[in-house]
Amino acid sequence: MRVLKRGAAMVLAAALLALGASAPAAADDWAVAAEEHPVAEGSPVSETAWTAARPPGGAFDTIGLHRYRASGTPAATLLYLPGTNMSGALALTDEAHNLWLFLAARGIEVFALDYRTHAVPADAAPEALAAMKDWDSAAFVEDIRVAAAKARAESGRAKLFVAGFSRGAFLAYAYANVEPEAVAGLVILDGPFKAYAPKERVDRAAAVAALAATGEWASDVGGSHGWEARQDLMRAVITDPNGPASDAAFNTVGAQLAHVLQTAWGPGALANPEGGVSDPAVLARLLVGYDRYYPAVQDIDGKVISAEADAPDTALDDRWGKLDIPVLLFVNTGMGADWVLTALYSAAHAGSKDVTFTVLEGYGHLDVLVGERAATEVFEPAFAWISARAQ
């Protein structure tokens, strides 16, 4: 692990104009989905959950928010934005593999968001998935504004720390561009915003038209193997990682999953269980809880915004280079040099004078969240960083 501290001298713009967007939902627009209860027997952390309807009011236009906290007065409040197909619901209930519980047990209150995707059932009819055509990054950032307003109302804080993993990191940067005055700091968990070496500009209208021609508005995490086969593999590993594999090439089902994840995005890119960085059983518990579908249009948004310093027709990067907000970045090396450089570039050029980089050597993407050393190499530094900047 390498940790680098860097100051970037940037001048904050004299006036930051508020985004012309709809006002966040009022506190009474949220409904309690689960009253406060312990997350697990013997845990000092409790959970409360809420849901809120979002426009235009379709069957899946609902977001959720989970609060994780221990007893006593929190030292800080953090809003957590999950990665693609992830949610704010607990997949892992041990703090050694869950940043939210680690922070909450130490006095940092965590609000974790459920995107609209969490309301979409795995067996949703294909025609119902067309609702995702309007679930672009701007729509999700508006949902984040609503969740942030609720977190501020519940916590009594004017500013929140905002953390995001993977695509959640992209959305954290985007949200900070929209409401910088409400962000105390960004905890970026293995995700970029702007490319350090941009390729050609992406024509968003043409890309969306091409997507519309396919009619495939939702990406399916089940991939070529299918959703049920994916889920069956995860459940088998959770039940007994030393049980028999469905593929004769492996001695155990745990070894089978380890190899699938080791090679999914290239050697050690998605995760590095064969290198001992993560445990297949822990990874299975994380992955089995994924939401099946995610809006494909957001892949286009990511390409459009990353390719230019100020992408046209979006306000999600309008303050890029002028974000005078502390940034803490953790980035894996398993996804290659371009990934590392793009993540570093995004953090360094956001506009902050207070940027800390942590390069996690030998880690894959998911290992940043649930690796066997994540508690000491990610969670503890994140706790110390937030604590030092809490007001």
Task: List where the protein language model places each region.
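Alpha/beta-hydrolase fold nucleophile elbow
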Residues: 155-166
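Conserved loop-alpha-helix segment in the C-terminal half of the alpha/beta-hydrolase fold
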Residues: 331-360
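Alpha/beta-hydrolase
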Residues: 203-326, 330-335
